A protein has these predicted regions:
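N-terminal secretory signal peptides
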Residues: 1-39, 57, 66
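Generic alpha-helical secondary-structure signal
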Residues: 38, 46-47, 221, 367
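Residue-level detector of intrinsically disordered/flexible regions characterized by low predicted structural confidence
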Residues: 4-5, 15, 24, 62, ...
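Structured, non-membrane catalytic/scaffold regions adjacent to prosthetic-group chemistry
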Residues: 68-455
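Short, cationic motifs built from Arg/Lys/His that form the positively charged side of catalytic pockets
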Residues: 40-41, 277
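N-terminal export signals
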Residues: 36, 42-67
Length: 455
């Protein structure tokens, strides 16, 4: 392993895990949790990691260790002795039945209703950088809208020369563009601000996914409408029952935004905005308005609900931190993690993901001793702007001792992923959004992995 010359972060190697039945949650989340029966509350908190752990067990745990000798060499396995399903069995291909535990997961007590809530991508179970469409996390404010494609319309109005209305077929007549980008909810990791809370990478970092989007450049649509010189902002509005809307700077809209109608080569899923959504590379997911139905061009910010009372952070001095669109450089180790413990001593490959809303990932460093020594990870091609990047630390020998794993990403602008203490020094402990702090996993001598906060 190659050591870097960058300094190790200060601080003693003392874990501060939260108890399973007493967690320091943000006030709005704590009130929901406190309304639950104490016994069920303890089971939910303790079981968050177990949900992913059950999935991990199906992948690499006792089920794999207890192989049927009749199917092992030199015997002929049972599946080699019978005809399998024909080509007419699955008109739309599905995952293997043995991967049924790899699913998006939903935390019941997180919100009052699932129609205005979120579920989480199983990052621990994925390889490469592309998220399968069926595993991309969902965030809804009024449930997923079932839009009839023939009735779909996108309006552009306001400070334009020619107000326009596009059908879905109209959008598809424009020259298509395809790009890979990550989409991250601004609240990804938000529950970890005050200490280690959720024991599983699916729950600490699972509000992110990465796909290839195909659609039409938003710039081309605005050029068709003819934007007036005094225009500076857009108000983008969705067709869901919540009427989700956000303000978007015109400069960003003219840069790299698109109206997407496909993801990973197929039409958008309903929960991802079918038949069309806004793609805002590098910006927080709340701005990627789904089921987009209207774009109003104006000369001032619209101060929508989702950018004033919501998606803002209260600073220690009483001011509000808002219009924080860009997602900062971030990384997380996805193996080992609470869902994927170390089963054997010896050589290990540490795997993870890094991303930045500012551009490409330039480097990722990994420590196994809580920051005393850092080692430069191997980045896997392709490395693309505003896209997930896969990293590996090869050849780490785990001898069974307690280890503290962290990753630290650096993007092409030179921005370095911070420790939580550095974020809290500036933003206090009341934040929910834009937590890009370094994550710590503790590997215990048993091989089990847990989410901890170093003192």
């Amino acid at each position: 392993m190659k050591k870097t010359t960058s300094p190790a972060p200060s601080g003693s190697i003392q874990a501060t895990p939260s108890s399973s039945d007493k967690r320091d949650l943000p006030a709005d989340l704590a009130s929901d949790l406190n309304a639950i029966d104490p016994g069920r509350r303890r089971a939910l908190l303790a079981g968050l990691g177990a949900a992913g752990g059950a999935a991990a067990a199906g992948l690499m745990g006792p089920g794999r260790a207890m192989a049927d000798p009749a199917n092992l060499p030199p015997n002929v396995a049972e599946w080699s002795q019978v005809l399998g399903p024909g080509v007419d069995a699955f008109p739309y291909g599905m995952p293997s039945k043995y991967e049924k535990t790899v699913v998006r997961r939903y935390v019941e007590w997180l919100t009052a209703t699932p129609e205005s809530s979120i579920n989480f991508t199983p990052l621990y179970a994925l390889d490469g950088i592309v998220t399968p469409n069926g595993l991309c996390f969902e965030r809804h404010h009024g449930g997923a809208a079932e839009v009839i494609p023939e009735d779909y319309r996108l309006m552009i109005n306001g400070l334009v020369d020619r107000p326009l209305i596009f059908t879905l077929d109209d959008l598809k007549r424009f020259p298509p563009v395809s790009r890979f980008h990550f989409l991250e909810c601004a609240a990804n990791g938000g529950m970890e601000w005050r200490g280690a809370q959720l024991n599983g990478v699916q729950f600490t970092h699972g509000m992110v996914h990465c796909v290839q989007y195909t659609g039409v450049s938003l710039r081309r649509l605005l050029e068709e409408a003819g934007v007036k010189p005094k225009a500076k902002w857009l108000m983008v509005e969705g067709g869901d029952s919540a009427g989700m809307n956000r303000t978007l700077p015109l400069d960003k809209a003219l840069d790299d935004c698109m109206i997407a109608y496909s993801m990973n080569g197929e039409r958008l899923r309903t929960e991802q905005g079918y038949p069309a959504r806004l793609v805002v590379p590098g910006f927080e997911g709340n701005m990627w308005v789904k089921w987009i139905r209207r774009i109003e061009v104006g000369d001032g910010a619209y101060m929508a609900r989702e950018e004033t009372s919501k998606y803002t952070d209260l600073m220690p001095d009483g001011r509000s931190r808002r219009f924080t669109w860009e997602m900062d450089c971030k990384s997380v180790i996805t193996s080992p993690c609470p869902e994927l413990p170390c089963r054997k001593k010896g050589p290990q490959v540490i795997k993870g993901l890094a991303w930045s809303g500012r551009g490409k990932i330039a480097r990722v460093d990994v420590t196994v001793d809580g920051g005393r020594n850092w080692h430069q990870a191997r980045l896997e091609d392709p490395i693309m702007s505003k896209c997930l990047t896969r990293f590996y630390l090869d050849g780490w020998e785990w001898n069974g001792d307690t280890a503290y794993l962290q990753s630290r990403a650096i993007d092409e602008t030179g921005y370095v992923q911070p420790e939580m203490a550095a974020l809290q020094a500036v933003r206090g402990v009341n934040s929910v959004y834009h937590n890009n702090a370094i994550q710590t996993w503790r590997i215990n001598p048993t091989g089990e992995v847990e989410n901890v906060r170093l003192a």
